[in-house]
Amino acid sequence: MADTDHYITAGIIYYCQEKYHQHVQNLAREGLKKYSNDPVLQFFKIYGMLMEDRVQDAIRRLEPIKDDPTVVLCSTMALIYAHKRSERVDREAVADLENKLKETRKSAGPKALYYAGMFLWLMGRTDKAREYIDRMLKISNRSREGLVLRGWLDLSSEKESTVNKSIRYFEEGIQDNKDIFALIGKAQYFMAHQNYSGALDVINQIIVNYPPFLPALTLKMRLFLAQQDWDQTLETAQRILLKDGANIDAFQILTIHSVTREGSTEKALNYLRELINALDAAEPRNPMLHLHKILPISSLCGRNQPILKQVSVVIGRIFQTAPHAEVATALANNFILQGNVTEAAGWYATAMKLDGNHLEGLTGVIQCQILQGQLEEAEQQLDFLHEIQESIGGTKELCYIQALLASRQGKEEQIITELLKKAVELHYAAVRGLPLGVEYFEKLNPTFLINIVQEYLVLCPKQPKAPGEPLSPLLKQALSILTPVVSVAPALTEPLYYTAQIKYLAGNLEGAQGSLQRCIEVDTACADFHLLMAQIHYAQGKFAECSVSLETGVSHNFKVRERPLYHLIRARVLRKTGELQEAIKTLKMTMSLQEMKRGALKKSTWGSLNSSDKVSIYLELAELLRLNGEQHEATKIIQDAINEFGGTPEEIRIVVANADMAVAKGDVEMALNVLRDIAPNQPYYTEVKQKMAQIYLNNRKDKKLYIGCYRELCEQQPGPHTSVLLGDALMNIQEPEKALEVYNEALHKNPQDASLANRIGQALIKTHQYKKAVNYYEAAQKISGQDFLCCDLAELLIKLKQYSKAEAVLKQALAHEPVSDLTSMVTDAKCLGLLGTTYQNYKKEESADILNKALELQQRILKRVPMEQPEMAPAQKQATSEICVQLAEHYVDQRNYEQAANYYKEAMVYSQDSKVKLQLSRLYLMMGDLDSCENHCSALLENHSFKEEAAMMMADVMFRKQDYTKSIELFDQILEENPDNFAVLSKLIDLLRRSGNLSKAPMFFEKALANSSRTTLEPGYNYCKGLYCWYLGQPNDGLKYFNKARKDSEWGQNAISNMVQICLNPDNEIVGGEVFEAPDEADGLLGEKRESEMLGVRTAEKLLKEFHPRTLNGRNQLALLQNHCLMATKDKANVETALSAFTEMATSEKDNVCAILAVAQAYMILRQTPRARNQLKRLSKVPWSLADAEDLEKSWLLLADVYIKLGKYDIATELLKRCLLYNKSCYKAYEYLGFIMENEQSYKDAAANYRLAWDYSNQSNPAVGFRLAFNYLKDKKYVDAIDICHKVLKAHPTYPKIEREILAKAQTSLKP
C-alpha cells in the first residue's frame, strides 16, 4: 500500500502544504506506477487537480473512488468542496453528499478518519481536523500515524501553548528514522523554537536515509537561512539544482540573495528569469503560486527599475490567468515603486471593482490621491475607510496614509509622528518572531519602511548634530526602523543611503561613511551617493577627498552641477582652502538656480534641496563675504535670509549666525543680546542656550554664567535630557561631585536610561569613589539589563584587581543561548575578551581557551560586518587584533614563542598597529631571529611615536650581529635629540660595557649635564652614574649614586636591587666559585672580611624593607633578593632555606634563569657540585637574551669554574668565549682564561688575558694585578711586572704579598 511508502506519502503531503499542485499530481502518478489503483494516491492526484481549479475534471475522477472505505470521507468532503466551487452549484448533489458524510462518519474506520482529518488540515480547517483525528486515535489504540498528524495539527496552531504540545505527539508517533512525515514535523517544531542544531540533526537523518528526497534539502536550505548562514544556504541551493535543474525554491533564494546581499541587478534578473521559467515548467496552472513566489522579490528590490519591469510583466500575465483583486493590487504596488502613480491608481481601482471590500486596494487609491495632490478627495475616502477600520482595527497602511495626508496638510508634528510610530509598530509586529526566510523578507517590505523614514526626515533637523548637542529622537527612531533592513539586506542601496544620511545628521560620520561606501560599491554611478560622501568628507575635514567625491558625482551625472547642494559643498571646500573669491563666485551663481527660487522646495527625495540647505547657502555666502572684508554685503545677505525665512523654524539659525558674526567682530554683548531674545517655545532654543553658554565660557571665561545657561535650560524645559546637558557641563568644568547630583536626579526621572547610568559610573570613578562605582554599576545593570554596563562593571573590577567578581559578572552576561544578531555577538565577544583578561591575572591556564572563543566569535563578526554594518568594520578589526595580541602575550608568558609570533602576525592582519609590530619585533629578538627583528624595526624607525623603542631594539640587534659601531650610533641619535633621556642612556651604558667601549660613557654624561643645570638632581642621571661606576669596578661610588635614585618611583626599584647586589658581592666574585678561593678561606670567611660581609648582608636586608613592588615580577624579584641575603651568610641552615625557596621558584617557572642560577649557587656553597653542575648545564642550553644576559653570564662563568676544577679546560674555554661574545668587558672571563693558560704554562697568553681582565676591571682588583705581574715575571717581562706591582701597592698598600713574591724577584732579575 502507498500509505506505507514514506517517501511518496511524505513528499505528497509536503507539496500539498507548499501548494505545489502539479508536484502533488506528478508524485501521485509516480506512486500509481508502483501501487496501481491505490485509492489514496488517486485521491491526492485529484486533490492536485482540484486545487488548480479543474473542478469538473476533479468531480468526474472522484466519483469512482468516493465509496472506497479508506478515502470515503475525504473524497466526499472534496466533492462537496468541488461542487461549491462550480460555476453552477448543484445544491441537491451537495445536500446528498453532506447527508452521506454524516452517515458514513458514524461507522468510518481509522484510515477513513485519518485521511478526512488530513484533507481538512490541508484545507486550513485545523479545529475540525482535530475532531476527526482524536476520534481516530481513540478507536485505533493511538495509532502512530494518527499521533504524528495530531502533532502536525498542534504545530499549525496559532497558540504557543498548543504548539508546545506537538513534540509530545511526534515523539510518541515516530516509529523509526524512516517516517519522513513525522521527522519533518519534529524538525519544524525545533525550527519554531529556534533549536536549529536539533532541526539540522533531524533533517540530516532524512537526507542520509532518503538521498533522493528533495524536500529535505529544501528544508535544510531554509534552516541555514534561518541561521543567517548564507554560505551554506547557497551551497545547499546549488546542491538542489544539481538534482533538479528547475527547482523553484532554489531559484527564488538565489534571486533574493542577489538582490539583498550582492546588489547585482544582472545576476538577480538572470535568476528571476530562471525562476519564472521554473514556475512555468513545473507549475503551469498555479497562478497564485507564481504570484507568491514573485512578491518577495518585488517587495525587496526597492526601486530597482529593471527588476520591477520584469516583475510587472509577470504579474500582468498572472492577472490574465487569475483576475483577482490581490493580483491587481500587487501590480498597482509595482507601478507605485516605478513612480507611475497614474497607472497604479488605475490598477487599485480595478482591484476595488473585483472586490469592493479589498482594503489594500482602497488604501492604495487614497495614497495615489495624496501623491497626486488631491488632498480633499483623499481625506473624504480616508474618513470612509476609518469608519470601516474601527470594527476590525487599524492597519499599518492606514496609519501610514493618515500620516502622509497629515504631513501634506501641514498638521502638527506630534500627530504625524504618532501615526508613523504606530505604522512601524504594526509593521514589525507582523515579522516579530519569524525566522529569516522568504516570508520574513516579504513581510519586511523595505520600501514601505523607507517611505516612513522619508516622512520622519521631513521633520528631523537638516544639519549634522554638533559635538555635545542632543540627538534628535526622530533620527533615533528613523535609524531603528532601517537597522533590521540593513542587517538582513545589506546590498539594498536605498535603505543604506538613508541610513548613511541619518548617521550623518546624527554626527556619526564614520558610521555614515561606512554605510555610504557600501552604497557606492553596489552602485558607483549614483551621483547622490557621491554628494552625500562629499558632505561627510567635508564634516571630517578631509577637503581633498571632498573635492574628489564632488567630481566623481559630476562624472557620473553632469546634471549634478545644476544642484545648489553641489555648489554649497564646493564653496565650503574653497573657503577652507583659502579661495574666497572663487567660493563667493560659486555661491552667487548658485543663488540664480531654479531650486533657489521661492516655492521651488520639494519634499525629501534623493538629492533634493530642503529649506535647511537653502538657508545654509545664504549663511555660507554671508560668512564668505565677511571673511573677504565685504561686511556690508554680508549684512545684506543675512537680511535677505531673514526676509525669506522669517517665521519659519530656520529663522533661528539665521539669528545664531548673526550672533556668530557679532562674536567674530568682538561684539560679544551684541551676540548675547540677540540670543537672549529667543524664547523657550521657539525652535532651536536648546541650541541657542548652548551657544550662549559657550560664549560665556570661551569669551567671558565666566564658569558661573556658563552653568547658569544650563540651569535656566533645565528650568524652562525640565526633563532627563536637559539634566544630562547640565551634568555634562559640570563635568566639563571639572565639578564631578555636582554633576553626580544632577545625573542622579535625571536617573530618577528616567530609571531605564543605561547611558545615563554609565555617566554616573564614570563620574564616580573620576571622583575616585571606586567602591560606590562598583555598587552603582551592579544596581544599574540589574535595573536596565544593559550588557554594556556589565562590560563597564567588569573593566572596573579588573582595574581594582577583583578578578573573581569580574568573572562572575562576565559569566552571568554570557549565560544565554547562542545569539545570531550582530549587536549581541559583538557584546558577547567583548565579554569573552574581558573574561580572558580576567583569567590572565587569575586563572592563567583557562585564559587561552576563553580568548580563542572570543577570537572565533570575532572572526564570525568580521564576516558579517562588511555587509550588515560596514561602519563597525574598523572597530571590530581592532577588537580582533587586540584579542590576538592577548593570546600572543599569553603564549609569550608560556615561552611558546612560535605560537605567540603567529598570533602577533594575525593581529597585524586585522590592524596595522605599530605597537603590535613593536611587540612582534621584541619577540623576534627573544627568539634570536635577528633578521626579522631588524626588518620590523627598520619600518618602525620611520614612526616618531615608536622611534625610540625601535632604535633601542635595533641597537640590540646590531650588538648581537657584532656591529658595535652601528649599535652605538643608534643610541647616539636618540640622545642627540634628548640628552636627558636616561632610560636610553642606561641601556647605552650597558651596551658600551658589552661592546668593550665603556670608556665612551663620560661624553654622554657631559651632554646631559650641558642640557640642564638640574641634571645632577635627576634620579635617572644618578642611576646611570651608579651603573657606570659599578661596571667600572667602583662599587662604593656606585652605591652613592644609586642611593640618590632609590626613593624615585621610576628608578627606585632597580636602584635598590643593584645596591643589594653590591652589598652582597662588592668585589663581583663568582658566587659558589672555587677556582679563585684562597686557601685560608676554604673553611669559611674569618675575621675582618667575615664581619665586612655580614655588614653587607644587614645593609642589603635593610634596603629590601624599602622595596615595595607593585607587579608580580617585582614581588618575585623581592623574594629572590631576600633569599640571596640568606645565601650570602654562608650559614648552612640559611643556605638550605634559600635553596628551598629558589627550587620552588624554578619549579613554578621552568625557564626562570635567575632562579635556576640561584639553585646552582646554593648547591655550590653547600659543596654539592654535581647537582649544581646539572642545573648549570640546563642554563648552558638557554638562548641568550638581553633580559637574562647577566644571569646567563654568571651561570656560564660558574660552570666554567666547575669544569676548570675538574681539569676540563676545553669545555671551560668554550663557555668563557661565549661570555666574551656577549660582553667584551667581562673581566672574569679573561681572568679564568688567564688561569687556564697559566696552568698550561703558556705564560705569554696567560699574561695577555690577565692584562685584559686588569684593564676591564679598571685596574681595581689586586688579585688580578697579582696574577698579571706573576705571569709577566714568568714571561721575563720584568719591567711590566714591576709596573703592575707598583700600581697594585699604590691602590692597596696593605697587599704585601705582591711586594714579597713578585716585585723583589723582578727587581733582582733586572740587576746585572
UniProtKB/Swiss-Prot annotation:
SMART domains (alphabetical): TPR
TPR repeats: 4-38, 110-143, 147-180, 182-213, 214-247, 325-358, 493-526, 528-560, 564-597, 615-648, 720-753, 755-787, 789-820, 829-861, 881-914, 916-947, 948-981, 983-1015, 1019-1052, 1193-1226, 1228-1260, 1262-1295
Keyword Repeat in annotation: yes
GO biological process: intraciliary retrograde transport; protein localization to cilium
Positions in coiled-coil regions: 365-392
Matches recorded under PROSITE patterns: TPR (PS50005), TPR_REGION (PS50293)
Domain of life: Eukaryota
InterPro entries, sorted: ARM_TT21_2nd, ARM_TT21_4th, ARM_TT21_5th, ARM_TT21_C, ARM_TT21_N, TPR-like_helical_dom_sf, TPR_rpt, TTC21A/TTC21B
Xref: Pfam families: ARM_TT21, ARM_TT21_2nd, ARM_TT21_4th, ARM_TT21_5th, ARM_TT21_C, ARM_TT21_N
GO CC annotation terms, alphabetical: cilium; intraciliary transport particle A
Keywords, alphabetical: Coiled coil, Repeat, TPR repeat
Function: Component of the IFT complex A (IFT-A), a complex required for retrograde ciliary transport and entry into cilia of G protein-coupled receptors (GPCRs). Negatively modulates the SHH signal transduction.
Protein family per UniProt: Belongs to the TTC21 family.
UniProt xrefs under PANTHER family: STI2 PROTEIN-RELATED, TETRATRICOPEPTIDE REPEAT PROTEIN 21A
Quaternary context: Component of the IFT complex A (IFT-A).
Designated name of the protein: Tetratricopeptide repeat protein 21B
Organism expressing this protein natively: Xenopus laevis (African clawed frog)
Gene that this polypeptide is encoded by: ttc21b
